[in-house]
Amino acid sequence: MRVEVGQIVNTHGIKGEIKVKSNSDFTDVRFQPGQVLTVVHNNNDLEYTVKSHRVHKGLHMLTFEGINNINDIEHLKGSSIYQERDHEDIVLEENEFYYSDIIGCTVFDDQETPIGRVINIFETGANDVWVIKESKEYLIPYIADVVKEVDVENKKIIITPMEGLLD
C-alpha cells in the first residue's frame, strides 16, 4: 500500500537539498538514509533514495542519491512524496495508529452524532492533534479523556468532547 508522506515545498541551497512538509508519522524511519521515496510529478512516478535527512524549522530537509544540484530537483517543488507501507517493520503500541489509517475516518460524538472527518494530524509534543472538518474545523487532542474508540477497519472514531471543544 502506498501512502503519502509529504510534499516538497521548496529547495534549500544550491546542492539539491529539498524542504519537505511531512504529513506522516515515523519520519525518523521514513526519511532515514537508504529509504526509497516516490515523487509524483506530472503524473510520473520518480523513485529516489534518501541520501541525508535533517529537521530544520519544522521541515524535513532531504537530499537524494545522485542529486547534487538545485537544477536537478527544483522542478519538483509542489510534488507529493509517497512511500510503500507494506515493508514497514514498525511495531505499533496499543492505541497507536498510522496517520494514514486515521486520516479519512469519520468522527462521532458519544451520542453517535457525526462531527466530521479527520483531514490532518499534527504533533504538539505532548500529544497529537487531529484536525476534523465538516461545516467547521475542530482541533481534537488525541488523549484518552477525549478519544474513546478508534475503529480503523470501519473508519470510525468515537469521542467524548470536553466542554467547549466543539464550540
Curated annotation (Swiss-Prot):
Cellular component GO terms, alphabetical: cytoplasm; ribosome
Alphabetized GO MF terms: ribosome binding
Stored InterPro entries: PRC_barrel-like_sf, PRC_RimM, RimM, RimM_N, RimM_N_sf, Transl_B-barrel_sf
Gene that encodes the chain: rimM
Name of the molecule in the record: Ribosome maturation factor RimM
Function summary: An accessory protein needed during the final step in the assembly of 30S ribosomal subunit, possibly for assembly of the head region. Essential for efficient processing of 16S rRNA. May be needed both before and after RbfA during the maturation of 16S rRNA. It has affinity for free ribosomal 30S subunits but not for 70S ribosomes.
Subcellular location as annotated: Cytoplasm
UniProt KW keywords: Chaperone, Cytoplasm, Ribosome biogenesis, rRNA processing
Subunit structure: Binds ribosomal protein uS19.
